Amino acid sequence: FPLLPLSKTVSFERKVLDIRQMPAQVLFPHWDDEFEFIYVLSGMMEFRVRQKAFLVSSGEGFFLNTGEIHSACTYQSYDCRFVIYRICPSVLFQTEDNPLYQKYIKPLVDHPSFGFLTFVPKVPWQKYILEMIRKMNDICERPVDGYELKINHFVNEIFYYIFHNVNL
């Protein structure tokens, strides 16, 4: 499952994976230079980040900051299909010297305790983020001209909710 760095012409990548079809049924430890949103489409898996293990079920998800080492594996006999969105920071703002990036995004992503977030539907603001990730998935399943603009919109909306709900 090696992912190559995103090119300068691509602002995000979407990949749907089945943990059972991966080598050794494992997403081996790795990190990415991009943000990642992970959404479990069906089943359950064990997800690891910062030496912590989480059981993630259908309808739940994760946010991973850039540079966070993470891995995943099967949990008991469960199958698991999940989607990963790798998002270039430029989706939020074209340059890091943008005042809005400096004011809202940089303090979050540079904070040492902000490595990841879990999203569960029982928390209202997290449920809303999960709904946005589902909408991103629907749009990517049936892309039409301009779909990248909708993805950009949802990513900005997600960061708005993260900014307003995460206390660092």
Question: Where is each model-derived feature located?
Answer:
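An amphipathic alpha-helical interaction segment
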Residues: 120-168
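A conserved hydrophobic position in a structured secondary element of the catalytic/binding core
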Residues: 64-65, 87
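Hydrophobic aliphatic residues
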Residues: 16-18, 109, 162
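Residue-level recognition of conserved beta-strand edge/terminus positions
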Residues: 65-67, 73
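Residues embedded in well-ordered beta-strands
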Residues: 36-38, 84, 157
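A hydrophobic/aromatic-rich effector-binding and dimerization subdomain
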Residues: 1-13, 73-137
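Generic protein-terminus/edge-of-domain signal
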Residues: 1-61, 68, 102-103, 113-116
